[in-house]
């Protein structure tokens, strides 16, 4: 996804003074949020939470990631885009439908990553944006999108995730690469989405070169630097990394953080979003997404 120099604590700026307006718009299209955890045993109260999130990718390590999460009963939030995959017709395609359905049954949470994995490149005049999708029919092309175009791509991913998982998508999104502008954030807020970044220590490094960033060093740095409240980000497969991150790092990272007293929570429990989501879930007669 190309985070590179964009590694920053965007999490501190995710909910602006327009949160009330964001909530009002969210109520117009969110389906009721489902409750009741599906993990085998009740999850303990989380005193030192970290928030593990996964963005889609080539899906080659997706089965392994699911197995580790299930084994350790770790709830996560998946941000979905229909990216090119090693097998099948895209990460949100029919080939992976059963995988997503299983994650929904396990009570993980889901949010938009833009359907076409659409990178923001620049703001243009007239509330428009230079966008370059890395998936879909226009992959690799620079497009001129208005607010409605961007919102449609956000909603398309949310709707597809709902179909695949049987769960309502959260009114959250992560821009590919974390690349945004204030104008893009405002555009997304106008159709009900709050942006989710990640914490500096939460950038787990799975898309960095394995020649310069070994799995052992990535694990060591994560265990050393992650703090309570951090949002962590990894991917369901990175094309460019020769030594895959998840098989070597995910399980020891989870175990190591738990041994240090950390616990895992969904973004549903994050203080920046929990109030918003609580108000959405309590509101009767909410309309469904168009």
Regions from the language model: what does each represent?
Residues 179, 184-225, 262-273:
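His/Asp/Glu-enriched short active-site or ligand-binding loop at hydrolase and phosphoryl-transfer sites
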Residues 3-22:
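Bacterial N-terminal signal peptides that target proteins for export
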Residues 19-32:
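Bacterial N-terminal signal peptides
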Residues 54-56, 78-83, 112-114, 175-177, ...:
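A cross-domain feature marking catalytic cores of carbohydrate-active enzymes
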């Amino acid at each position: 996804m190309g985070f590179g120099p964009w590694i920053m604590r965007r999490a501190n700026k995710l909910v602006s003074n327009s949160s009330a307006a964001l909530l009002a718009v969210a109520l117009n299209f969110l389906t009721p949020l489902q409750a009741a955890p599906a993990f085998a045993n009740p999850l303990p109260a989380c005193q030192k939470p970290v928030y593990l999130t996964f963005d889609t990718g080539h899906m080659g390590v997706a089965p392994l990631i699911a197995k580790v999460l299930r084994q350790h009963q770790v709830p996560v939030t998946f941000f979905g885009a229909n990216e090119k995959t090693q097998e099948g017709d895209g990460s949100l395609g029919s080939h992976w439908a059963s995988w997503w359905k299983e994650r929904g049954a396990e009570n993980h949470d889901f949010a938009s990553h833009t359907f076409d994995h659409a990178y923001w490149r620049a703001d243009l005049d007239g509330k428009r944006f230079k966008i370059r999708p890395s998936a879909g029919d226009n992959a690799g092309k620079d497009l001129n999108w208005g607010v409605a175009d961007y919102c449609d791509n956000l909603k398309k991913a949310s709707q597809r995730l709902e179909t695949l998982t049987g769960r309502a998508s959260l009114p959250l999104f992560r821009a590919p690469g974390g690349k945004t502008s204030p104008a893009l954030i405002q555009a997304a807020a106008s159709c009900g989405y709050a942006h989710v970044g990640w914490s500096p220590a939460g950038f787990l490094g799975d898309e960095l070169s394995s020649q310069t960033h070994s799995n052992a060093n990535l694990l060591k740095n994560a265990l050393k630097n992650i703090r309570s409240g951090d949002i962590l980000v990894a991917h369901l497969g990175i094309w460019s990394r020769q030594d895959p991150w998840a098989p070597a790092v995910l399980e020891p990272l989870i175990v190591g953080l738990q041994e240090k007293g950390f616990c895992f929570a969904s973004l549903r429990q994050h203080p920046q979003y929990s109030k918003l989501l609580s108000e959405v879930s309590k509101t009767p007669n909410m309309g469904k997404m168009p």
